[in-house]
Amino acid sequence: MNMNHLILLAESGSDITPELAEENGIIIVPMHVSFGGETRDDGSFPVPEMFEFYKKHRELPRTSGCTPHDFEVVFERLDREYPGVPILYLAYSSCTTCSMQSALIAAQGRENVLALDTKSVTAGQAAIVLTIARLLREHPETTLEQAADAAKGLIARVRMGFIPGDLDYLRAGGRVSNGAYLGAKILGIHPLIEILDGKLISTKKYRGTMKRVVMQMTREFPAAQNLEKDALWLIYGAGLGEDIMREVEAHLHEQGCQNLTWVQTGCVI
C-alpha cells in the first residue's frame, strides 16, 4: 500500500504478521518480553521459546508495552521518509498496557499523528487495523478523519473472547488464585475471557476437554454476540490441534459464517 497518503501504526501485540504488515503498509512498533535476564522485542523470536523457558525454570516471562523511545524512533524515521504524511495509530487496549500513553508522549509536537484506542488486543486489534488498511487500499482518497471515523465504528462493533488452554500462566502472573487454579484443574473448568471496554474479563465457565469447550463456544459466542457472519477472526495459540481448528471452521461454515481468518497469538497476550 502507498504510504505517501496515510500511514497506519499498531503494536506487535496485534499479532499482525510481518508479511501482512508489509503487504498492507502497516508500521509495527515492538512491545517487549523479558525472561532469562534479558528483554527482547516481541516478534523477534519464536513463541515456543518463551513456553520452554517457563517449563524449565518455572519463572513467568514478563511483557511490557512500547516505550516513548520506541515510538520516537518510528516517528523520526517516518518524518524523514514521509514528511508530513498523516499517521493513524490504532492502539492496543490502553487498559492493559502503557503503549498508547507512550505514543502520546512521543507524538507531542507532531500534528500529523492521530491516536485511537481500539480497546482490543491480538486478533481484535488486528481485525480493526487490517480492515482500515483494506479501506485505504480500495479508497486511496480516504482522509485521516474519514479513516478515524471508520475505525471508531469498528471499535464499537468488535466483540472478542477466548478460552485459555490452561491456567498455568494466569496463576503464575497472579490473575487467578491457587484455589481457583486447583478447582479448575480438578473439575476441568475453562473460563471464557472476553474483552469488555478494553479489559480482560472472565464472563463464563465451561467444563470438559479443550475440544469440547471450544466447540461449545463456537456454537454459542457468535449468536450471543450477534456477530456479523461475513467476516470472523479466529484466535489460536501454539498447541491448538489442527483437528479442532478444522472442526471450528466446518461448524462456522454450517452457521453461514464466511471469510474466516485465523490469527496466531504471539508472546504478549
Please place each PLM-identified region on the residue numbering.
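An N-terminal domain-start capping segment
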Residues: 1-5, 74-81, 91-97, 175-181
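Glycine-rich phosphate- or other oxyanion-binding loops that anchor nucleotides, phosphorylated ligands
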Residues: 57-94, 101-102, 148, 155-158
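N-terminal glycine-rich anion-binding loop in soluble enzyme alpha/beta folds
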Residues: 7-70
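Short catalytic-loop micro-motif centered on adjacent basic/acidic residues
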Residues: 8-9, 62, 89, 115, ...
